[in-house]
Amino acid sequence: MCIALSHSLAALNSGIMSTHQGGSVRSIRPFKSSEEYLYAMKEDLAEWLKDMYHLEIIVDNFTEILENGSVLCQHANNVTEVAREFSVQYPQLAEKLQLPKSGVKLNMMAQPGTFLARDNVSNFIQWCRKEMDIKDVLMFETEDLVLRKNEKNFVLCLLELARRASRFGMSAPMLIQMEEQIEEEIREEMDLPPPEIPVPKPQRKLCDFKNLDQMVQHLVSRCTCPVQFSMIKVSEGKYKVGESSTLIFVRILRKHVMVRVGGGWDTLEHYLDKHDPCRCTSLSHKPAIKLGSLQKQVSAVHEVKTRLTPRLDNPSKVETTLIVSRSQSPLPPVEWRSYSSGRTRTTSSSNSLDNNENSPTFKMSPSDRRSMSTSYRAHERSATPSRKLFTEDNPEPQQLGNPQSVNFRHHHSTSSLASQLTGSEEENSCLSEVFSESQSRRQMGRTTVMSLKEPAMKEAFLSHTQSAHRKVMSATEQNNIQQGSRIVNQSINSQDSRPKTPSRFIRPPSPSKQIHFFHNQQNKGVEQNPKTQINSCTRSPSPVKQTSLTYKQEFTKRPATPSRISSQYKDGDKSAATEIIPSQDHIKSKPSVSSEERTIRTGRSTPTIHLNKNGITYREVSNLPPRMQPKPDALELSHSIERDCMYTPLPIDPEQEKQIYRSLEDEILTNIKVLEGDSEENHPENDSHGFNMLEKSTLPLNASTLKNPSGQGSVPRSGVYINTTWQSGACYDDVITELTKGHVKLNRVDVENWISKIPSKGMVKEAEEAHTSQRNQVRENGHTGAVSQRTIVRKKTPSTEIKGSKPKQLPSQRARQLALENKKKTVDNVSENQASTFSGDSGETVQEKIKLSQGLKPKRTLKKPERVPSIYKLKLRPKIRPRRDNRPEKKPSRIPTPVSYRQMPSRNNGKAVKRTQSYQANKTSAPQTLNESQSSTVILEDLDSDDKTLEHSAPSQAVETPVTIGNDQSKTEEEEESWV
């Protein structure tokens, strides 16, 4: 028979279901996943193990009791004993079945999580695979139980083990017994032969079916869709479901309604969620919560993708509305009844809203999420003509209900409100007044949440708001041109007579349809100032459906920013643009009226920028009365967002532009003075590198403020302030004169020069010129000694100037001086040695040898730095000694030294002698070579890097090289080998 799904039948069965309410609610609670049937299986297995082994095991500590593996191994050994007894009693049947033959080794003292516990679990797994032949798809791993990685496979493995053990007489859980009962029913229906040998089993008492139909009916009737999932009862515990009439077997397992699916089990609720087309497409699923009264039970909310709603223009035609957003909160219950009049529809909808306010489901879910999701659903409907709402009567208290219902109603669109509201204009105005009054009372609690939501919502809806606002303003302006004077007079009279009754309008749902309200307002006797409509701020969350927000006449006026005025009225029509300023004065003239009025607000105060003759002034138009002001944190967040959206850059007058250009020119001139350094570098007393740092430091301060258009005060502009009394340090003509001089040669600047100066290149040029003249004199006269002395003096000149001009010396300059001192000492030592060795020679010969020793500069190679040797060189370097044999029968023999090491000193001595002879033979060409090397040395000394400083000390080593070679000839062969 078909199960009735009406609410009357559910009310009749409420008394019967009262005893099973706890179990039904537990089985139909919302699923996080498909693990609800695991709870029922673990509950059954826990009770089964408790009866067999007298364990204190329940569902909550199911895995904790079994994770050490000792209980599992005991169960495996028990199954093996039962199999042995069965093979003795039924030997013929035992041959057809695969029975376990060996047990499992276990450690009873294993602690959970230890390796001993893992060994127990691993032994049980091997026994299941080898002895019981359980397939891998139903097996679990050690980590699944020890670390709780996969409890599902662990539970399925225990059920499969109990299923196989029940074949040879072992007691089985309730689920296995129900499986066997269902198999017998199928065998009887299909006329299959009974099993060959009935095995006696210790049976347990199964649950009866007296409450099964009521529980199944309760679970199926939770769906509120017009076309519900069909379940037809065939026999006790057997139903046909769906259009395909699939046969299912339903059983009650303690507190769960279980369905036999294939080779396993599932809960009926989860089965319906997977197979009911309506529930498969649902976005949320909430349980039915029973209220205090037993006769009155609110049906559960079931959210679906398609929802049939009546249209305003054609009530007989239905339209499918798609739900766009996932809602974590339920919808109001749908009452499927036909409405004859609009008043009945209004009452039923308000009652349904009031019923939902009392349900715990609404209390658990945030009101803001519900309102947001409801507004998205309302926006999906196509555009329909809007209605006007006026406030002329007092609000009806029975429609007010709860602030949550008003919040739910607040986010509907115009068409959804109009579909629920029919009748006279007075009735609509009453509901609109309720709309605004309840919103003002509820605003304080929602201020913080709404202010946090505004940053995300403002960026998404800003473009739609601006475009729709322009259309309303343009349409209102055209209407104002025709009826301007007459409406102004009527609005003044109406404001004096009824100051607290504002005129309202609702934005049409489609941007293409602009519906004006002046004609109907004249019929009602309530008029509105046309200038107010220009500045009324309306917002819409989508371009299709726009939120129906009502606004007060006086309090929500916000002047347009200068950018908007120029963009809207740039076509030459300036009449509407000039009307904005009087509306601002009109706001100031009536502060008492605007402070008393209340309207629908978004929980923020909007900063507006007024550009008048006295400059720019910021003014905040607050949409809240003083007692309803939001928190300062929420206001700061909304103010910063509004300021970013509403800010318009200031115009720059020609004087400010000229000041900026002058500051740029001075900056360019200062940079040019920094880069040019020839004239300033020649004066060592100037310690600031030829330019005044004071002028550069005061330049940003002078260019830090900007005058307003009238010249009064200073206004911040992007964090830069330009002073009104700015005076430049240089003239514009000086810059032109400096630039017309031509290309300025720039010098290379080192970082160290910002602290202490280096010798200028002018000195290097003078040294080169003097060196060239001296080289010419040497070619004519041939006096090499004088040339070398002049060269040495010339090399000393830059260093002495450096000492005079710099109080501090950097590491690179100290290294350069050390190299020059070493070179000087080396030259003096060489001259003394040459004078003592060749005492019989003339002074000219001694000077020639000094020149030759300086000219013997080797090839440029890497040089070790002159520093203290490392510990490796001092202590850890072994001294190489000749290898000796310690054979007693023979004399110790020396390993000969390689020939290459013996010939190296002699080769070096021969090369030195050859070089000396060649340079003595070529006396005419030697002075020229020496001078060239010295000139290159002078040029290299002007470089500032430390790598070049290392090269200056290379000639000193070159001078020392021949002397060292000459003195080392007396070294023995053994000492040479030791230093190799």
From Swiss-Prot:
Highest taxon of source: Eukaryota
Domain GAR stretches: 207-279
Subcellular localization, as worded in the UniProt entry: Cytoplasm, Cytoskeleton; Cytoplasm, Cytoskeleton, Cilium basal body
Protein family: Belongs to the GAS2 family.
Sequence ranges of Basic and acidic residues compositional bias: 366-382, 763-782, 883-892
Regions annotated as coiled coil: none
Organism from which the protein derives: Xenopus laevis
Job description of the protein: Together with gas2l2.S, regulates ciliary orientation and performance.
UniProt KW Coiled coil keyword: no
Biological processes per GO annotation: actin crosslink formation; microtubule bundle formation; protein localization to microtubule plus-end; regulation of cilium beat frequency involved in ciliary motility; regulation of microtubule polymerization or depolymerization
Comp. bias regions, Low complexity: 337-359
Record keyword Cytoplasm present: yes
Positions of the Calponin-homology (CH) domain: 39-166
Result of knocking out the encoding gene: Morpholino knockdown of both gas2l2.L and gas2l2.s resulted in mosaic embryos and impacted the number and distribution of basal bodies on the surface of ciliated cells. As a result, ciliary orientation was significantly reduced.
Alphabetized PROSITE patterns for the sequence: CH, GAR
Bias type Polar residues, positions: 396-407, 414-445, 475-496, 523-553, 828-845, 903-938, 954-969
GO molecular function list: actin filament binding; cytoskeletal anchor activity; microtubule binding
Name of the protein in its database record: GAS2-like protein 2A
Keywords: Cell projection, Cytoplasm, Cytoskeleton
Region annotation (Disordered) ranges: 323-445, 474-503, 523-607, 763-980
Name of one Pfam family that matches: CH
GO terms under cellular component: actin filament; cell projection; cytoplasm; microtubule plus-end; stress fiber
